[in-house]
Each structure stands twice: as C-alpha cells, then as structure tokens.
A protein has these predicted regions:
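Histidine-centered, transition-metal-coordinating active-site segments
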Residues: 15, 30-34, 39-295
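Aspartate-rich (DDxxD/NDxxD/DxxxD) Mg2+/diphosphate-binding motifs
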Residues: 1-26, 32-33
Length: 295
C-alpha cells in the first residue's frame, strides 16, 4: 500500500495533476488516487488472461480509502468500485490508515529538510514560527552541544521529529483500538473515525508545520516560477496527443479508442504515466522548445 498509493501521480507532481485535471475536465477530470487504481486493475498487463496485477480486495480497498471514506468517487474510482465493490463509505483497514499517516510524516519532515537545503527558509525562521520544530531543535542541540555544523544537525532534527511523531502515533492508535475493543478489521472499518492517527495535541502542532511549509516552500516564488511551465508541458502534451492520437507510440496508438470520453481518458493514461524527463523530451518532439530546462 505504501509503495502503490503514489503510482497515479503524473509528471511534475501536483502541478502536473492540476494541469491534467483541467484538460480532462470535459471527460470527468483526473485524480491521481483513481488513476493508481486504474493502473493496478486495468493498465498493467502482466497476465495472459486478464488485465491488472491481480491484487487482493484488501489492497484495492486500501488504495481507494487510505485517506478516509469516499462519498462522491470520480469516474476512475467508480469504475473500479463497480467491478470490485469497495464499501467506499466506510474507513479502510489499519494497514491503509498507517500507510496514509506514514506518508504524511515522511512528506512533512523531508520537505522541511529540502526547504532548508534549498535556502527557502532557515532554522531560525522555522523555529520562531513552529513550536514543535523549536522544541525538537532544542533537544537536538542539547544532545549534540559540540556540533556546530548545521548540515549534520538538520538530519538529526528530522530524525527527532519523526521519532516523536511515530511514538505519538503508536500510543494514539493503541488507545483508539482499546476504546473500540477491536477484535477484527471489521471493527476498525465500522469505528466511524480514523484509528491510526496522531493525538489531537500533536496534530495541532503538526498543522502549524504544514502551514509554514505551505507558505514558505510550496508557495515560494522560486517554486511558483516552475509551476506554470510544468503545467504548460502537461497541457501541451495532452492537446497534441488528443488532437492526433496517431502520434502516440506503438500499442498506445493502436489501441486508442475513437469515441469520447474513452479517447481522452486513454490519452490521459499515457500522459499520467510519463516521467518528468520523458515528458520534456516528448514535448520538444511534438510541440516545440520546452518552457522548462531539460532534467
């Protein structure tokens, strides 16, 4: 689950997803979670008798609901749910819930590391605004009083934060399992709330970290300057291939449906499966000079 839940991300991360969602809006839009399920149930072809990877129902359910119940599924998820009813209105099992919170923990902490390394903000700035980081940084500098090199202490800060989050997650999850007297996965699904989660107190502190990263990293001018060109590449590729599906490679062209929305979704599947590098290369072949530097 932890490995598979990000399979549906298109090139250029969230910028690419936003662009693909816009251009596919007339045909139901695009969602990376639904696309991940589409990959493992339809697009992969590793067996002679059927499409997909032959994953268990529990794995499909976890991929669909790792972020919680779904009441208005998009077209891709609705197709999977029609074939393998996933009880979308209930919570997923513990494995999926743990994969989701583990992803959040890793994402937040390594983005902090990346932001400092990229010079988007300093230790002084983030500790002044985020009490949780300030507390962890104080613990790190106290444990290593003779170390002045920030490049050695920042990774230790990340370890300290992850350690505290994981310890809190374990304690909170055990407590919630005891509260519902869980004897089976059915009890977890029927609990009506997330079981594997951080405590309310730490969740509030981590929310302050997320808010800081959103303002100082994700919305930073240096990052924003890459967002529009990234979206332009995805939009240009989709338009070029949707207008002339014969320009798709090999089997993608041979099996492209003639009617909509199947054709648009087929082209969307192809674009969503690209790496950043391949997207830039193909854009230059089909559209023109890339608005982004080659990777």
């Amino acid at each position: 689950l932890a490995l598979a839940h990000d399979l549906g991300h298109p090139p250029f991360g969230h910028s690419g997803e936003d662009a693909l969602e816009r251009v596919m809006a007339p045909w139901g839009g695009f969602d990376h979670n639904g696309h991940a399920l589409r990959i493992v149930t339809r697009l992969e072809s590793r067996y002679p008798g059927f499409d997909g990877l032959n994953l268990s129902w529990e794995t499909l359910e976890g991929l669909a609901k790792h972020n919680g119940p779904i009441f208005e599924p998009g077209w891709a998820l609705a197709e999977v749910d029609a074939a393998w009813p996933l009880d979308l209105a209930s919570h997923a099992g513990l494995e999926a819930q743990i994969a989701a919170i583990a992803d959040d923990i890793a994402y937040d902490n390594h983005d902090l590391d990346d932001g400092i390394r990229a010079g988007l903000f300093s230790i002084e700035e983030i500790t002044a605004e985020v009490p949780f980081v300030a507390d962890c940084w104080a613990a790190v500098t106290k444990s290593w009083p003779g170390v002045s090199a920030r490049r050695r202490l920042v990774p230790e800060l990340v370890r300290e934060q992850i350690g505290r989050m994981v310890s809190d997650l374990l304690a909170t999850t055990r407590s919630r399992l005891a509260e519902i007297d869980a004897r089976s996965v059915a009890d977890v699904r029927a609990a009506g709330r997330t079981i594997a989660t951080l405590s309310p107190a730490l969740s509030s502190e981590v929310r302050a970290l997320k808010d800081f990263l959103r303002e100082r990293m994700y919305r930073a001018p240096a990052v924003a300057r890459l967002r529009d060109p990234s979206e332009a590449v995805v939009e240009g590729l989709f338009a070029a291939l949707h207008d002339d599906p014969a320009r798709l490679p090999g089997d993608w062209a041979a099996h492209c449906p003639a009617d909509e929305p199947a054709r648009a979704r087929h082209v969307g599947d192809f674009v969503a499966g690209m790496t950043d590098r391949y997207a830039l290369k193909l854009y230059e072949q089909l559209v023109g000079p890339s608005p982004l530097p080659r990777i």
